[in-house]
């Protein structure tokens, strides 16, 4: 995830290979942004309902698929 993408409401996926491997691959939504503007920590509401704190570089932005009616 790029720094400019780290904002509330963005859909994210936790990167694989982190020290907290149980979260690798999980998806969620950024709920809050904390800390220094150049290195924020993000509260993420995960798909299982838990809320966890991650550094912005531990996440990938999920590309939303266009919906067709």
Placement of each model-derived feature along the sequence:
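Basic/aromatic-rich interaction segments and small domains that mediate binding to polyanionic partners
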Residues: 3-68
């Amino acid at each position: 995830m790029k720094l400019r993408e780290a904002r509330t409401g963005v859909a994210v996926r936790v990167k694989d290979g982190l020290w907290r491997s149980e979260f690798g691959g999980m998806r969620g939504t950024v709920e809050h942004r904390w800390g220094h503007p150049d290195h924020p920590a993000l509260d993420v509401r995960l798909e299982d309902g838990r809320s966890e704190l991650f550094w912005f570089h531990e996440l990938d932005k999920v590309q939303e698929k266009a919906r067709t009616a």
